[in-house]
Amino acid sequence: MSNTAYIDTCYGPVADDVIQRAANIRLLICDVDGVMSDGLIYMGNQGEELKAFNVRDGYGIRCLITSDIDVAIITGRRAKLLEDRANTLGITHLYQGQSDKLVAYHELLATLQCQPEQVAYIGDDLIDWPVMAQVGLSVAVADAHPLLLPKAHYVTRIKGGRGAVREVCDLILLAQDKLEGATGLSI
């Protein structure tokens, strides 16, 4: 039997170790496809790429930013619509077209003067693991690649693109006693 202690949250029980890790977070890094979106790529008649983003995720991101917790995006793909979404949310650290996400990660650490234990990363696939292995709180979305799930410190109860980012934002805010007073913007 495990000696792990759990804290009750609105998302269900969360291991005390995860709450302790979340209490130290100053930066949340998000992947996009499969995390901020459902992983599907919609193509318009003119070849334009379309994605759906969850408003709850956006609100959670705004709550983090207004609580002085930085948010960054590191993604392997490039899309103009992602620049627009990042601007809408107030995310100023956007790294697109990153086949090696560690390069952007190390740049963020230097720019924001963060230690690895102050960083949370939420991903869904094997390309995310090199960064996840180095951060203080590694998170996999509920429908992440099966090999990623057992490696993460925390697995969301909600699937990518369906509010998983909001779940992580709430967890960080809860751990830092900022959830009750957190407010974002209507987005």
UniProtKB/Swiss-Prot annotation:
Binding-site list for substrate: D33, N54, V55, R56, D57, G58, R62, R77, R85, K101
A GO biological-process term: lipopolysaccharide biosynthetic process
Keywords of the record: Hydrolase, Lipopolysaccharide biosynthesis, Magnesium, Metal-binding
Extent of the signal sequence: none
Name of the gene this protein is made from: kdsC
Alphabetized SUPFAM superfamilies for the sequence: HAD-like
Purpose: Catalyzes the hydrolysis of 3-deoxy-D-manno-octulosonate 8-phosphate (KDO 8-P) to 3-deoxy-D-manno-octulosonate (KDO) and inorganic phosphate.
PANTHER family: HAD SUPERFAMILY MEMBERS CMAS AND KDSC, N-ACYLNEURAMINATE CYTIDYLYLTRANSFERASE-RELATED
Subunit architecture: Homotetramer.
One Pfam assignment: Hydrolase_3
UniProt family annotation: Belongs to the KdsC family.
Cofactor(s) the protein needs: Mg(2+)
Pathway named in the protein's UniProt entry: Carbohydrate biosynthesis; 3-deoxy-D-manno-octulosonate biosynthesis; 3-deoxy-D-manno-octulosonate from D-ribulose 5-phosphate: step 3/3; Bacterial outer membrane biogenesis; lipopolysaccharide biosynthesis
Catalytic activity: 3-deoxy-alpha-D-manno-2-octulosonate-8-phosphate + H2O = 3-deoxy-alpha-D-manno-oct-2-ulosonate + phosphate
Record-listed Mg(2+) binding positions: D31, D33, D124
Annotated protein name in UniProt: 3-deoxy-D-manno-octulosonate 8-phosphate phosphatase KdsC
Highest taxon above the source species: Bacteria
EC number: 3.1.3.45
